[in-house]
Design a protein with these regions (language model features):
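Short amphipathic alpha-helical interaction segments
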Residues: 185-201
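Short alpha-helical segments that sit at the start of domains
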Residues: 134-165
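Elongated scaffolding segments in large macromolecular assemblies
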Residues: 179, 188-193, 227, 244
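Short acidic, hydrophobic short linear motifs in intrinsically disordered regions
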Residues: 171-183
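Short, cationic-aromatic polyanion-contact patches
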Residues: 151-160, 208-230
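A short, conserved structural fragment
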Residues: 199-209
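Long, low-complexity, charge-rich intrinsically disordered regions
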Residues: 1-144, 229-315
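Short, locally clustered residues in the helix-turn-helix/winged-helix DNA-binding domain
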Residues: 165-171
Length: 315
């Protein structure tokens, strides 16, 4: 029964994940959402959203339609190097789908994606996108949640724009380079150089202590950007990686045919391997170490439900 409980919780989480993806696409300016659907209020991580949507493609066909639309209209606002780095944390199937997405990006004229498109992408590029679906002329960088894309449009795609977006998303808190790197996935060296340049230009504040920390004053930036509020930062990448690895496992023969003991062991390994998804986002879930053997399955199902509830209120 415990395994059935996990499977049911996973399906509930899958529906929550699809809802989050649509709300974030709505926030970055696609007309993909259902009329009246609320957009995201937290900052959208563009590369993480692409990978998240690719992982969910078979569960929601419309996501592939909006992804191919983005490959033709908004791909210039994405970092190829960053998405390659983030993709390593997703199930293997996402790697192939990323190559398919990259093929469409190359067809739109962005040659940066050639290294990702692969030699066979043209022959196996996923379902044919439905051309009758209309998602708009291109990204609309209006909503507060689309701030990272807006900063990239203004400052260029790279560490400086994302560093500024991260600092604006933490409400004026002092942040170490290590913390910023955990959120943005840029190297400490790249972020240190970017932060020092921006501090010299007085775009960010640097502390006098060692190791140096950085912050911004949110109010002047909010006024400059003409935003009624600044969207909070969420650590989407580690959370999405946990979600997609978990759902891929629940769909696998390993889960379907395994004993409760083996399934509980794998569930424990998943949570431990992706613990940053919970600690960085402040999601309080049961500790795997507090349960023995198969008894963890019920706690794992609870972890999935808690994560789904957090998604609903935090997106």
């Amino acid at each position: 029964m415990s395994r059935e409980t996990v499977a049911k919780a996973a399906e509930e989480l899958r529906r929550s994940a699809i809802d989050v993806a649509w709300r974030q696409w709505c926030a970055v300016g696609s007309l993909a959402s259902i009329a009246g659907e609320a957009g995201a209020s937290a900052l959208v991580d563009p590369e993480a959203l692409i990978l998240f949507s690719l992982a969910l493609r078979d569960d929601e066909r419309r996501l592939w339609d909006v992804l191919t639309w983005w490959a033709g209209t908004g791909v210039g606002l994405l970092s190829v190097q960053r998405i390659k780095k983030l993709a390593r944390e997703y199930p293997p199937a996402v790697q192939g789908r990323l190559a398919e997405f990259a093929w469409y990006a190359v067809q739109s004229g962005d040659k940066r994606w050639q290294s990702l498109s692969g030699t066979g992408a043209a022959e196996s590029r996923g379902p044919e996108p439905r051309r009758d679906k209309w998602f708009g002329e291109g990204p609309e960088l209006i909503e507060p949640a689309a701030l990272l894309l807006r900063l990239r449009a203004g400052f260029g795609v790279g560490a400086k724009a994302d560093l500024l977006g991260f600092l604006l998303g933490v409400d004026g808190a002092w942040c170490s380079i290590r913390l910023i790197s955990a959120g943005t996935y840029y190297t400490a060296r790249a972020l240190s150089t970017a932060a020092e340049d921006m501090a010299r230009a007085r775009l960010v504040h640097a502390s006098g202590n060692k190791p140096v920390e950085f912050r911004v004053n949110p109010k002047p930036w909010s006024d400059l950007l003409e935003l009624p509020r600044l969207s909070p930062w969420r650590y989407w990448q580690p959370l999405y990686a946990f979600l997609m690895n978990t759902l891929a496992w629940v769909d696998s023969d390993e889960f379907q045919g395994g004993t409760d003991y083996l399934v509980s062991s794998k569930a424990r390994d998943l949570v431990i391997a992706h613990r940053a998804a919970f600690t960085r986002n402040g999601i309080d879930v049961p500790r795997p170490e507090d349960f023995k053997g198969e008894s963890y399955l019920t706690a794992f199902a609870g972890t999935l439900r808690m994560t789904g509830r957090w998604l609903a209120r935090s997106v």
